[in-house]
Structures are given as structure tokens and as C-alpha cells.
Amino acid sequence: MGKEAQLVLLLALPIAALRMNIDVAAVRAAAAPFSCAILRRGDKYLAEVRGADAQAAAGRLTCYGGKRERGESSLECLVRELNEELGWAPEHIPAEPACSLLVDGYLIAHFYEASVDRADFATEGRAFEFVDEGDARWSAWHARVLAARGAVAVFDDGGDPAATLELLRKVPTAGEDGLERRYYEPL
């Protein structure tokens, strides 16, 4: 199998050892509607503790990041979001994502991994913690991404692909070329 395709193991699915081919190069080259950071300090990860009233992942842990604006690259989005949410961004963020998240075949986010050497963030009243990768409070999507670093995280739980597409159509980058491309058909 060439560099253009990589065999990806779907994690935590009820069907044991389900495998599929995904064009990882195409996924990585595509503009994702969200950019997120996997920020680590030693063996701990910086996580946003989402409030009980949060619209997404209420009461769960998530990586920091957010929606990409039109005309922004994924890295520009990430730096902007980290500065907005933490008052800080790492000096060095690799150009290549550590992981990309596909949900129901659609690209949702690129996740970039970087180190953090501080804990004095300006979080606008939001809580944060340094936690283990295996912390049970991680949101389902973020737990999947942490487990799949270096590959593509696929999240198919038998949900409605139309709902995922509807989510994509609500972000600022809606309508951009390729945003509604499916990288595989859920089984």
C-alpha cells in the first residue's frame, strides 16, 4: 500500500477489528472546519472542562480549539483560538496534524500536538485541568482522537450522517469547496 493510502483501524467499534482504506494524504490536505490542540506537559494533557450548560460536550473534557474562519488556514485558526481561549499559543506547532477526525465519513477537525510549559492561562472563566489520556471524562470524539494520534480517528456510532452534514453546514466555513466531501461510506 502506498503513502497515499493508509489502513486505519477503527477504534472502539462494536465490530472487532473492522478495517478500511482512507486516503490520509487527502484528509490531511483538506481544510477542516475545526482546528484543535493536543497540548501535553509531561504525561498529562491540558483539557478544557466544559460546563454543564455547554452546547457541545457538556460536562466533559475537550481539547482547546474551535471553528475555522473563511480564508484561515487550519494553523492560523488554531493559533487564533488558543490566544482567545488561553491567552497563549505554543511557539512551535507542527505543520502536519497529529490526527484528523472523521465523523460519519466527513472531516470535522485537524488536531495538532504541541508542548505546554505553563499553567497560568487567561481562560475567561472557563475551567481547565491537566489530566491523563485515559481520563473517563474526555468527550467521545476527543478520547478517540487521543487514542488515534498519528493516524485518522474515525467516529461512527451508527448515527445519522445527515446530522453530521448539517453540523458542517452551520460553521463559518460552510460552502467551501470540499467541505462536504465524504472520505468513506459508513458501513
Predicted regions and their residues:
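The catalytic Nudix box helix
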Residues: 64-98
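Active-site-adjacent beta-strand/loop module that shapes the phosphate/pyrophosphate-binding cleft
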Residues: 32, 41-43, 99-134, 144-151, ...
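Charged phosphate-binding loop/patch that engages nucleotide di/tri-phosphates or the phosphate backbone
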Residues: 143-187
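Short histidine/acidic/glycine/proline-rich micro-motifs that form metal-
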Residues: 67-69, 102, 137
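Classical eukaryotic N-terminal signal peptides for Sec-dependent ER targeting/secretion
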Residues: 1-8
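N-terminal chloroplast transit peptides
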Residues: 9-12, 16-19
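N-terminal strand-loop-strand
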Residues: 21-62, 90
